[in-house]
C-alpha cells in the first residue's frame, strides 16, 4: 500500500509540474526591443519551439486587440504581436526625425522580426497591418509560411464607400481636408468602428477606450494624419501584392467580418482569383471581428494552419 501511495504522489507531482510548464509556456508576456529610434513594445505567448504567428494590428488599435486570441492558440503556436510606431506602447519619435509612412513602418517591423530571431512565420494581418505584412511577404517570401487575412485588403473591389472621399483627398491633399480627417480620432468614430455590424452587446468598451487614449496622446494625431495620406501608397501597391500571391501561392485564409463598411466582402472573395485554394470564411461581425468572434477565428486558424502548413 505504501508503495502505491508513493507512486500516486510521484505521478501527481509529475502531472502538476507538467501543468505548470504548460501554463508558463502559454501565458502572455510583455517586452520591448530597440529598433532604429523606436523602443518597440510587443506581446508574446506560446513556446518558442512551436510554429510562429506574427500578429499585425490595425488602426487605431495596437497589440491589445489580440489579448483574447493569443491565449486561445498559445498551446500549439508561438505568437508575437508588436505595436507599430505611433500606436499603443511603442515609442513615437518626432515627425521631424521619423517618417510616418507604411513603407517605413514595414521596415521597422521587418527589422523587429530579425532582432527577435523570427526566420519563418505565418502572419495574421488586419486593416493597417495588412499592407505592412504584405510588404514583408514581397521582400521575404521565403519567410512566410501562411497568411491569415482578417479584413486585410489588397483589392480595389474590397474598398468600401468611405474610400471615395479618401481618394479625393489623396489627389488633392489640402490642409483643410487633412484637418477634416482628424475626426477619425473622435471617441464616437472609434466606438463606431468597433461596434458597427456586430451582435448587440458583444463588444466591450476596453478596446475602443484604450485606442482613444493612445491615438490622442500628444503628437500622435499628426502622425496618424501622415499615415491617412500615405495609405495611397498601399493602394498603388495592390498589383504587386497580388503578383506576390500569384507567384508564391502561400496558404491563405481570409476571415472577414461581413458587415465591415471599410473593407467589404468582395475583398475577401477576390483572393481566390490569385490563390485558387484560398479558404474564405465570413463571420456575422464588423471591422473588429476579433472582439466578438475571437473563439471562432481561433478555431478556423488552428484548423487551417494544422491542415495546410504544419500537418
What do the predicted segments below correspond to?
Residues 2-8:
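Sec-dependent signal peptide recognition
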Residues 11-18:
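Hydrophobic h-region of N-terminal signal peptides that target proteins for export
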Residues 22-28, 34-40, 45-48, 52, ...:
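Flexible "cap/lid" subdomain of the alpha/beta-hydrolase fold that forms the substrate-access gate
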Residues 55-58, 81:
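Structural cue for short, hydrophobic secondary-structure segments
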Residues 59-69:
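The serine-hydrolase catalytic nucleophile loop
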Residues 68-77, 115:
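A short, Lys/Arg-enriched amphipathic alpha-helix followed by its capping loop at the start of a domain
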Residues 286-298:
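Catalytic histidine-centered segment of alpha/beta-hydrolase-like enzymes
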Amino acid at each position: 500500500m505504501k508503495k502505491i501511495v508513493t507512486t500516486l504522489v510521484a505521478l501527481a507531482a509529475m502531472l502538476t509540474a507538467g501543468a505548470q510548464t504548460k501554463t508558463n509556456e502559454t501565458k502572455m508576456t510583455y517586452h520591448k526591443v530597440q529598433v532604429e529610434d523606436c523602443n518597440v513594445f510587443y506581446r508574446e505567448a506560446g513556446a518558442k519551439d512551436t510554429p510562429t504567428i506574427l500578429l499585425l494590428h490595425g488602426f487605431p488599435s495596437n497589440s491589445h486587440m489580440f489579448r483574447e486570441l493569443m491565449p486561445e492558440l498559445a498551446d500549439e503556436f508561438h505568437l508575437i504581436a508588436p505595436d507599430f510606431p505611433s500606436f499603443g506602447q511603442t515609442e513615437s519619435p518626432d515627425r521631424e526625425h521619423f517618417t510616418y509612412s507604411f513603407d517605413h513602418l514595414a521596415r521597422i517591423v521587418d527589422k523587429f522580426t530579425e532582432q527577435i530571431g523570427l526566420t519563418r512565420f505565418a502572419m495574421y494581418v488586419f486593416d493597417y497591418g495588412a499592407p505592412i505584412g504584405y510588404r514583408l511577404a514581397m521582400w521575404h517570401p521565403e519567410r512566410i509560411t501562411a497568411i491569415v487575412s482578417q479584413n486585410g485588403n489588397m483589392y480595389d473591389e474590397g474598398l468600401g464607400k468611405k474610400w471615395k472621399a479618401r481618394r479625393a483627398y489623396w489627389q488633392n491633399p489640402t490642409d483643410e481636408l487633412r484637418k477634416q480627417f482628424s475626426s477619425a480620432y473622435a471617441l464616437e468614430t472609434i466606438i463606431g468602428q468597433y461596434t458597427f455590424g456586430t451582435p448587440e452587446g458583444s463588444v466591450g468598451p476596453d478596446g475602443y477606450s484604450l485606442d482613444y487614449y493612445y491615438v490622442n496622446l500628444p503628437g500622435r494625431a499628426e502622425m496618424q494624419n501622415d499615415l491617412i495620406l500615405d495609405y495611397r501608397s498601399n493602394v498603388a501597391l495592390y498589383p504587386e501584392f497580388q503578383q506576390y500571391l500569384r507567384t508564391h501561392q502561400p496558404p491563405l485564409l481570409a476571415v472577414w467580418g461581413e458587415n465591415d463598411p471599410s473593407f467589404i466582402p468582395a475583398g475577401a472573395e477576390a483572393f481566390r482569383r490569385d490563390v485558387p485554394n484560398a479558404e474564405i470564411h465570413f463571420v456575422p461581425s464588423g471591422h473588429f471581428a476579433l472582439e466578438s468572434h475571437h473563439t471562432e477565428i481561433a478555431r478556423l486558424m488552428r484548423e487551417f494552419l494544422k491542415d495546410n502548413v504544419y500537418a
